[in-house]
Regions:
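Anion-binding catalytic surfaces of enzymes that hydrolyze or transfer phosphate/sulfate esters
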Residues: 1-115
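Feature marks hydrolase-like catalytic cores characterized by long aromatic- and Gly/Pro-rich stretches
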Residues: 69-188
Length: 188
């Protein structure tokens, strides 16, 4: 950050801008007004300067205005509770993945070990999870899915250290058949 008295008097506290300030501001131009972008920017700096080997980031429950859709963060973070939660989750997954994609680009640009040529990204694993899912079925002739809590939440692990195209866990054929029967029944 530049020294912006009286809002942020860095000089007053013996502080100055980071040498990586311009790079981080270019990657996350809304870092100062968007808490999630700010967390990602800080995560990069914590990793780069090896202050931390692990960080936790997440959207908050406050509305953040801005971005191409005018709302950068809706209330209730990943879930609009009993109001169009599928659209809210699609919006939030896009938000999370775009922010994390930028973080990955920053980590790829930073060397980890000059001898091996590894970047910071080569030694990073990202785990994204929602706290729960919503009902998976939709009643016939309705435009909305159910709002009941379900265990069908989603998570994503991203890392060059992981074997891709792998399902962790499995599918219970009996549960799957029941789900498919319910779906077929609604089509009649």
């Amino acid at each position: 950050l530049p020294d912006m008295p009286p809002q942020i008097p860095l000089n007053q506290y013996g502080l100055g801008s980071s040498p990586d300030g311009a790079k981080v501001r270019a990657a996350y131009p809304s870092f100062f007004t968007d808490p999630f972008a700010g967390q990602a920017a800080l995560a990069f700096l914590l990793f780069k300067y090896r202050v931390s080997v692990s960080v936790t980031m997440g959207p908050d429950f406050n509305v953040v205005l801005g971005g191409p859709t005018l709302i950068a963060n809706p209330p209730l973070a990943f879930d609009f509770s009993h109001n169009d939660h599928r659209a809210a989750q699609a919006f939030m997954w896009a938000r999370m993945l775009n922010t994390i994609d930028t973080l990955i680009d920053l980590l790829k640009s930073e060397p980890f070990d000059a001898a091996t040529g590894e970047s910071m990204w080569d030694r990073t694993m990202i785990y994204i999870a929602t706290d729960f899912g919503r009902s998976r079925t939709r009643l016939s002739a309705t435009g909305a899915f159910g709002t009941g809590h379900d265990l069908n939440n989603g998570f994503v692990m991203i890392s060059p250290m992981l074997k891709g195209n792998t399902v962790l866990g499995g599918v219970d054929p009996q549960t799957f058949r029941i789900e498919m029967d319910a779906v077929r029944a609604t089509k009649r």
